[in-house]
């Protein structure tokens, strides 16, 4: 087991009261960064230490996320030797030396995660010296890494124009079909103003609602008087189908989700023929709803049925409060040949290697009212909107 002296040493580092002989500087007092994960902290940088003073773990990796989580960068170090609780120092290159910017601990998989407010930097992580089972484990450093070296931005839309521009366009305009016989995407529900894309939901007028109900009655055999009992709605959906496709990479968007229930906002991806895995990197059903927010994958089953692989988002600070829904949040999904990693505001919310797609997908942003959920919709709270500040894609160079 990890001996207690290393724990005390780590606590002393956090307090800024000991000299660390392995990185050659006195650790500065640290304070948690807003929104950072437990166990990760950052504060006033320590003094620099010369390059190359710590032996490298040649099998270790250091991943620097390209996503700007509202001023924070996520860095994940993975060491070849897993020692749960082992203190790890994240350092950025500063001139000819290294400057400590955060402290964390290894988990049982040998990983240590950091949130730091220093975005454009070259980093390394140092697993500090500890004693385990009566043996000293020497300090080891990961290879250095930076987001600029690991990622290249290949797509960006900040919705700065007055109208929707390529490659996004309205999808399925005016089309009513299951599971939305009583709602359809409409161009009028897509608006841009001051760099914000707003996707809306609104109840339609009596005249058009009557036409929709008559159409539903013809399709389903239901009496028109009983069709769409919860109302008829205009929805919004845009996508890059036929214009932009991506296979693997990191997709992120800064968004504000509607708090109203009876509808769902989604940032998702689909193949052009719709036969492969649908990737819902964020789907939101409103404040207080049973589904809440989800990271979800929808592969096809043996009989072409739609399956669900994913999880509800529960571990993001503040998500259970009403105020959270009035703010913008950055949602990301990293998709690689090894699997998917989902994050909200930099917090990992779901990770899986299941339902892994290898095919190109296009991007979709939508706010929809499906027939199965409109019984929870309160028309007095309409119109509602799903607001998007930007959406970006990065890939490995």
Per-region residue spans from a language model:
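GH16 jelly-roll
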Residues: 146-397
């Amino acid at each position: 087991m990890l001996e207690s002296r290393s724990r005390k040493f780590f606590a002393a580092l956090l307090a800024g009261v000991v000299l660390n002989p392995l990185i050659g500087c006195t650790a500065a007092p640290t304070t948690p960064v807003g929104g950072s994960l437990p166990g990760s902290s950052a504060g006033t940088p320590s003094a620099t230490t010369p390059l190359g003073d710590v032996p490298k773990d040649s099998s270790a990796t250091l991943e620097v996320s390209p996503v700007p989580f509202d001023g924070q960068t996520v860095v994940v170090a993975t060491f070849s030797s897993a020692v749960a609780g082992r203190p790890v120092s994240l350092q950025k290159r500063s001139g000819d030396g290294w400057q400590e910017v955060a402290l964390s601990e290894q988990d049982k998989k040998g990983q240590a995660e950091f949130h730091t407010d220093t975005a454009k930097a070259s980093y390394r992580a140092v697993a500090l010296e500890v004693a385990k089972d009566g043996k000293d484990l020497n300090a080891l450093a990961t290879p250095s890494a930076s987001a600029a070296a690991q990622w290249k931005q290949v797509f960006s839309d900040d919705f700065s124009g007055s109208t929707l521009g390529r490659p996004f366009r309205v999808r399925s305009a005016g089309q009513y079909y299951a599971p939305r016989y009583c709602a359809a995407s409409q161009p009028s529900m897509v608006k841009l103003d001051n760099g914000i894309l707003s996707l809306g939901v609104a109840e339609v007028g009596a005249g058009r609602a009557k036409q929709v109900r008559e159409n539903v009655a013809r399709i389903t055999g239901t009496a028109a008087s009983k069709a769409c009992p919860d109302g008829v709605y205009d929805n919004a959906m845009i996508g890059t189908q036929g214009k932009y496709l991506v296979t693997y990479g990191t997709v992120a968007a800064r968004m504000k989700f509607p708090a109203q229930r009876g509808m769902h906002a989604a940032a998702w991806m689909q193949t052009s023929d719709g036969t492969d895995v649908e990737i819902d990197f964020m789907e939101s059903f409103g404040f207080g709803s049973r589904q809440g927010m989800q990271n979800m994958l929808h592969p096809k089953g043996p009989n072409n049925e739609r399956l669900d692989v994913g999880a509800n988002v529960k571990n993001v600070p503040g998500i259970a409060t009403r105020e959270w829904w009035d703010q913008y949040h950055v949602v990301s999904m990293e998709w690689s040949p090894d699997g998917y990693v989902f994050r909200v505001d930099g917090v990992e919310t779901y990770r899986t290697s299941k339902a892994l797609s290898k095919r190109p997908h296009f991007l979709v942003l939508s706010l929809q009212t499906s027939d199965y959920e409109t019984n929870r919709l309160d028309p007095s709270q309409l119109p509602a909107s799903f607001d998007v500040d930007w959406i970006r894609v990065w890939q490995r160079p």
